[in-house]
Amino acid sequence: MTTETRSLYSQLPAIDRLLRDSSFLSLRDTYGHTRVVELLRQMLDEAREVIRDSQTLPAWCENWAQEVDARLTKEAQSALRPVINLTGTVLHTNLGRALQAEAAVEAVTKAMRSPVTLEYDLDDAGRGHRDRALAQLLCRITGAEDACIVNNNAAAVLLMLAATASGKEVVVSRGELVEIGGAFRIPDVMRQAGCTLHEVGTTNRTHANDYRQAVNENTALLMKVHTSNYSIQGFTKAIDEAELVALGKELDVPVVTDLGSGSLVDLSQYGLPKEPMPQELIAAGVSLVSFSGDKLLGGPQAGIIVGKKEMIARLQSHPLKRALRADKMTLAALEATLRLYLHPEALSEKLPTLRLLTRSAEVIQIQAQRLQAPLAAHYGAEFAVQVMPCLSQIGSGSLPVDRLPSAALTFTPHDGRGSHLESLAARWRELPVPVIGRIYDGRLWLDLRCLEDEQRFLEMLLK
C-alpha cells in the first residue's frame, strides 16, 4: 500500500464521529438510527473500494450528511409516484388509467379511516352482501336485473365463464378471439375456466348460420367479445347482440358479452366516437355483460358484470367469486363514481376521464401558446420550443383507431442529436413530480390534453 493510499484511507471518518455531528441528528430522527448507520457502513465500503480502484476519494466524501440525506430521500420515495402524463394517451395503462373523481377520493378516504357497512345490514344487524349497494346503482343505470363486482374485467370474464359454462362449449366468432395487454387471451381464459372454445366463422366474416351450426347438446353459451383494442375493416360481416340473442332464444342458449371498456354514456353527445354501452346490450336481451371500471367509465380498477338475476346468482355463489371480489376501497370509489352518472348534466365536469377526453383542441392550443414563452426562455439555448398540432388517443384498448385533435409543446435539439432528447426526457423523469412525454420524429412531444395543473408543471420544468 502506497503512502498516498494510506493517506486517503485515513481521511475516511469514523461512524461514531459522523453521528455526533449536528447535521446527522435530524437524519436519525427522520430515518432512524439503525438505517442511518447501515447506510454509513455501506458508504464507507464504497469509499474504500473507490480508493483501492482509482486512488481517489468519492466526491460525496466532502459532505457525508448531504449524501446520506439524498440517498435516504430517494429510498423513501413511494414506488407509486405521482407523474404529469403528457404522453397523449388519456387512459394510460402504465400510468394507472383513469384519474378518480374527487367524490371517489373522498369516499375511499372515509372507507380507509373507519369501519364501514361492507357486509353488514343495519336494518336487521345481520350479514349483508358487499355488492348490494352497487348492484342497485348499476341496475338503475343499465336496466339490468342484478350485478356482480370483481377486481378487474379479466376476472369478470373468468368468473362469467367458470360459473356458467365449465365443462361445456362456448361459441365465439374467430374474429373476436382477442388478446389484450399482458397476454390475456380469450382462448386461454376459456381453458382456465374449464370451457371448450368452439370458434366459428372466419377472421373477417361471421354469419348467424355459423353460430347455428355450431350449437349442440354441450353448448353452454353464445359469446360476443367487443374488439376494443383493434378494428377489422373492409370486407367484413358480424352479427350484433340483438340478432345473436334472437338466435339464442330459438336454440335455448344464453348470450354473454365481454364489452371491455364499457362506457355508461353515449360518447357521441360529447363529439367523441360512439362506443357500445352495457344498457344497450341489456335492452337487447344479453344475459350477462362484463366491462371495466377504470377505462371509459372513469372509476377504479374493477370488473363489473350486469345481467339476468338467475345468471348473476350463479356467479355470486361460485367459489371463484370470493377469490376475485373487490375490497372496500374499490367499492367505495366505484359507488361514488357511479353516483355521478345519476346527474349526467354535470358528468363532463366532475368525471376527470370525460373532462380530459372532451377538452377541445382550441382550448389546448391556447394553453400551449401560453406556456411556450417561459419554456422557450428556459430551454432555448439547447432546444427549439414550438407549439405543434397532434393527435391524442384514448388508450387502454378503447377506440383504438380513433384520435382526438390536440396540441403539444415540442422540443427539438438545435444540433439534431437524438441523445439530447433522451437526456432531456431522462432529466424530466427524475423530477420530484416526473413529467412524462414521448419522443417521436426527432422531437420530444408534450401533449397537453391531460395538463390541468399548469403551475405545478412550470414549477417542475423551470427548476
Curated annotation (Swiss-Prot):
Top-level lineage group: Bacteria
Entry annotated with the keyword Cytoplasm: yes
UniProt-listed InterPro entries: PyrdxlP-dep_Trfase, PyrdxlP-dep_Trfase_major, SelA-like, SelA_trans, SelA_trans_N_dom
Enzyme Commission number(s) from the entry: 2.9.1.1
This protein's record includes keyword Cytoplasm: yes
Name of a matching Pfam family: Se-cys_synth_N
Single GO molecular function: L-seryl-tRNA(Sec) selenium transferase activity
Positions where N6-(pyridoxal phosphate)lysine occurs in the chain: 295
Catalytic activity: L-seryl-tRNA(Sec) + selenophosphate + H(+) = L-selenocysteinyl-tRNA(Sec) + phosphate
GO biological process, one term: conversion of seryl-tRNAsec to selenocys-tRNAsec
Pathway as given in its UniProt record: Aminoacyl-tRNA biosynthesis; selenocysteinyl-tRNA(Sec) biosynthesis; selenocysteinyl-tRNA(Sec) from L-seryl-tRNA(Sec) (bacterial route): step 1/1
Chief place where the protein resides: cytoplasm
Record keywords, A-Z: Cytoplasm, Protein biosynthesis, Pyridoxal phosphate, Selenium, Transferase
NCBIfam families: selA
Record-stated family: Belongs to the SelA family.
Job description of the protein: Converts seryl-tRNA(Sec) to selenocysteinyl-tRNA(Sec) required for selenoprotein biosynthesis.
Oligomer status and interactors: Homodecamer; pentamer of dimers. Binds only one seryl-tRNA(Sec) per dimer.
Name this protein carries in UniProt: L-seryl-tRNA(Sec) selenium transferase
Source organism of the structure: Escherichia coli O1:K1 / APEC
